[in-house]
């Protein structure tokens, strides 16, 4: 979340940034934050003054008694009792103001960087780069859901029977392809210096608040109400929360973690042709990169992550493009985000396969994730993460773009992992 210092020192800039993200009632909300913070500070000032007076009077009572000034001592005792009673009410008032302030800050998104373009939605995102060759497919090319059925790779109907829509069952070479991609992505991450983590796929509410999914995405997360636990939307949540309430040594940075997990999203309200097959699922596999770094290095770290994801797509021989997201299409927590999309020749559309984001200090402030400098000062870290990669649409693009009359060709980089060159 935003720090009070950010808001008080740069009020107008914060409001403009929130308006770039199309956050409703930005000015009114920030004014409410400032008002609540002033109330908390004023109450604290009165409480501190009262506590100081109590300490002073308490010291004087003994001396007054020694000097035989019993009436004055009694007056001082009565005043101390009055102040202590008043302080109880002041403490409750200050605690309530602090709670109100915290809850209010939880509802405010991160402020985008100046380099984020203006815009309302996906149509306003800026194409930064395109790469790979678009595949020329035969006129009778099939979408991936038809290919999955033809080669008995994925059974969507069986998933509906077992669980419901959006929970496919991978079979035979379909399951092998899925596992091959996971191992390929993890190996590539390790080669780039990432340490693999195998985290839980359920988290508590504190973890959800730490990375910013709560309260913003409450309705989009699967909630196990009996135990008050949430299924994770990506490994970002458990892996980043490893560093909640932690003060790191400057020498430990940057921290580079990767994790493969199953991910769960309710995707409430999603329907139509864009959600067919693997295009949008409730459960999917993903390899996530998480980095924690010093503020002055996070821009470079972000670029390294972008280069890593681009390298994966190049090795998979997929046509891709990189988008700089506009303010209105960015996530609640991101300060800067780039999306990677691969082209589906069979569907004639672009499919998102990764978002790589810099969160500045927004998550670190929620998490209280800090580092100690050489000068023994503690500073908030910068956090970054991105998918490298999300599997469903990668699988969809691989099946569609590599279909031939003989079968589906496997990219050379994957053959050592699949053990076969063709699905036929």
PLM regions and their residue ranges:
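TRNA-recognition modules of translation machinery and tRNA-sensing kinases, especially anticodon-binding
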Residues: 27, 129-424
